[in-house]
């Protein structure tokens, strides 16, 4: 059954992570988020105060180690903790994709665990850059990384930053990730979801959250 506009909106993190975003842009994002009835907004750590100050009762998410993941774990953890202290209720952190490709799952787990410990009860989503893992390794690697995220205390696994040259979310990746975590964790599809058809395909594949920057266009596409 096709969801209603309100039902689809409830899956969405309305996202603005462009480096040129201003506090005014974030305030407009929050206003639009409240109008559209989305689950949350997702903004850069420096923009969390602006999102909180914009009010409207909208849940705020932020990012850590974004977008490369090539940050010392202690830096990711501190960045995430600062975002939570500023009012973020959720953190989307980026793994070290190179470590994952090298088979260093202990390092991947330790990196995630450091952020998990730093954010307390905040929701932790782990961005695995699924397109890179599939393009540069294989399905087994993606599954193993998702299970490592679960072992380290993640609440969600997330496909993509949307900034990696190998691409964003795919139905194939979402299905593999959903199977890997077996309903024990959420699955967030993000990156390149531009139409209602894209969004519905991700939900059908097992996504439980969607990261969208063009949320209004996606919702309007439901007809």
From Swiss-Prot:
Keywords: Cytoplasm, Lyase, Schiff base. GO terms for molecular function: deoxyribose-phosphate aldolase activity. Transmembrane segments: none annotated. CDD domains: DeoC. InterPro entries: Aldolase_TIM, DeoC, DeoC/FbaB/LacD_aldolase, DeoC_typeI. The active site is at 92 (proton donor/acceptor), 158 (schiff-base intermediate with acetaldehyde), 188 (proton donor/acceptor). GO terms for biological process: 2-deoxyribose 1-phosphate catabolic process; carbohydrate catabolic process; deoxyribonucleotide catabolic process. Gene3D superfamilies: Aldolase class I. Pathway: Carbohydrate degradation; 2-deoxy-D-ribose 1-phosphate degradation; D-glyceraldehyde 3-phosphate and acetaldehyde from 2-deoxy-alpha-D-ribose 1-phosphate: step 2/2. GO terms for cellular component: cytoplasm. It is an enzyme of class 4 (lyase). It is found in: Cytoplasm. NCBIfam families: deoC. Catalyzes a reversible aldol reaction between acetaldehyde and D-glyceraldehyde 3-phosphate to generate 2-deoxy-D-ribose 5-phosphate. This is Deoxyribose-phosphate aldolase.
């Amino acid at each position: 059954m096709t969801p209603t506009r309100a039902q689809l909106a409830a899956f969405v993190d309305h996202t603005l992570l462009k480096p040129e975003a201003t506090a005014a842009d974030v305030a407009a994002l929050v206003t639009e988020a409240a109008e559209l009835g989305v689950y949350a907004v997702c903004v850069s750590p420096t923009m969390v105060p602006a999102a909180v100050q914009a009010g409207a009762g909208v849940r705020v998410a932020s990012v850590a180690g974004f977008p490369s993941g090539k940050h010392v774990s202690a830096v990711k953890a501190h960045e995430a903790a600062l975002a939570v202290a500023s009012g973020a209720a959720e953190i989307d952190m980026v793994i070290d994709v190179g470590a994952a490709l090298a088979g260093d799952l202990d390092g991947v787990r330790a990196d995630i665990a450091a952020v998990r410990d730093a954010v307390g009860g905040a929701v932790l989503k782990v961005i695995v850059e699924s397109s890179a893992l599939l393009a540069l390794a294989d399905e087994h690697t993606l599954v193993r990384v998702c299970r490592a995220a679960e072992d380290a205390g993640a609440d969600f696994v997330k496909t993509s930053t949307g900034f990696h040259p190998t691409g964003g979310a795919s139905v194939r990746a979402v299905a593999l990730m959903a199977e890997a975590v077996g309903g024990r964790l959420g699955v967030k599809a993000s990156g390149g979801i531009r139409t209602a058809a894209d969004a519905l395909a991700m939900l059908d594949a097992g996504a439980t959250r969607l990261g969208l920057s063009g949320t209004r266009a996606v919702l309007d596409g439901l007809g």
